[in-house]
Every structure is written in structure tokens, then in C-alpha cells.
Swiss-Prot record:
One of its GO terms (biological process) is positive regulation of triglyceride biosynthetic process. GO terms for cellular component: cytoplasm; endoplasmic reticulum membrane; lipid droplet; Nem1-Spo7 phosphatase complex; nuclear envelope; nuclear membrane; nucleus. This is CTD nuclear envelope phosphatase 1. Keywords: Endoplasmic reticulum, Hydrolase, Membrane, Nucleus, Protein phosphatase, Transmembrane, Transmembrane helix. Residues 57-224 form the FCP1 homology domain. It comes from Mus musculus (Mouse). It catalyses: O-phospho-L-seryl-[protein] + H2O = L-seryl-[protein] + phosphate; O-phospho-L-threonyl-[protein] + H2O = L-threonyl-[protein] + phosphate.
Amino acid sequence: MMRTQCLLGLRTFVAFAAKLWSFFIYLLRRQIRTVIQYQTVRYDILPLSPLSRNRLAQVKRKILVLDLDETLIHSHHDGVLRPTVRPGTPPDFILKVVIDKHPVRFFVHKRPHVDFFLEVVSQWYELVVFTASMEIYGSAVADKLDNSRSILKRRYYRQHCTLELGSYIKDLSVVHSDLSSIVILDNSPGAYRSHPDNAIPIKSWFSDPSDTALLNLLPMLDALRFTADVRSVLSRNLHQHRLW
């Protein structure tokens, strides 16, 4: 009898210790992600010279169109864990939305350095969100990324896309009629099929905590705002992913 009680007590202790260890690992991974997110971030925004200020004053302020999924964030919903997300990786935030009268929870992971990226480029461009996702989901994600900064006020969703052969195409003329001043950042070449000369390609992101793709784009985006027509630069086969 005593032996049975000892075994039960030992099993209870082992189960409790396992749960405690899992919780510790969860907290450790979350802390590591936070450190990685911010430890290498640096991009010096130096004051413009009089010549640069004059040059910038002669061109229109550009519009940077931003995709969400696999460009700025990655998400998965209840019961679905894609193999690209490491088990136990904590989400940055959880969204609860109702789709077709069914409540769904989305676990959202932010691409490394996305907050810093948005903070910097919002000083250079008018930012516009254009996602092929449903508005009820895309709007909630954009709200979280905006974080009350009012930098992601203009938004376009699935209903603003064109469906062609099973793919959602983003028509940039919906955003602005002057395509010389629009840049789109999207991981899906099919999304900007109609405007390849306005696109900056970026690799799809799912879970790599060491990813620096957004940081790597800052020098280019900094320079691109001085051009009279962004297509004069972006038309040089960048949409073929040869340089990325």
C-alpha cells in the first residue's frame, strides 16, 4: 500500500516538474526572442544636407504598400500548427475573431525588427496596408502593428483584390493613380503581377528568429524616396528575386 502511494506521489511530482520545466522553457524562449528582436537594431537617420532636402522637396512623397502575412507577420489558427513554426514558440499576440459565425483564435508571430522597421519607414513614406486576407482578420493585425501610432491608417483587404486563376492580385491603382510614387513590399510575386516594376520582393518569413530582411531593406527604401519615378529603379529585374 505504502509502495503504491509512493509511486503515485512520484508520478505526480514528475508530472508537476515536467509542466514547470515546460513553462520555464516557454518563458526562456519568449525572452530570447525579445533580445534577438532588439539587440542588433541600428539604422542611423542622419540629418539631410541642404542639397538632399532640396532634392527631396522636388519629388512627391512616396507611398509604401505593405503586405501582412509572411511579409510582416506569420500566423496560424486553432488546431493548425504549420511545421515551419517551432513547437512551443510563443506568439507575439493572439487575435480572437468570428469567421462565418465561428470564433477563431489566431496566434500571430511578428517578423524580427518589424516594429523598428515601421517606425523608420513611416518617417519617409505614407504607409498603406494591402492584404489578401479578410478584413476582420487583416484589420485586427494592422491595429496591433500600428500600436496606436496612427501610421497604418489606410488599409485594403481581400475585397479590394482581383481574383485571377485562384490568386488574389493587388491593383495598385486602387491605392493611387500615380504609379510613379508607389512601392509595394510583398512576399508573393503573384500579388503584384500587374505591377512588377513597383515591387520590392522579400522572402517569405515563418519563424526564423535571426531574420534581418526588413533591416536590410532600409538603405534601399531610404534612397528610393529621392527618385522621381520608383519604376526607374525597381524595373531592373528586382521582381525576379535575383538580388534577394
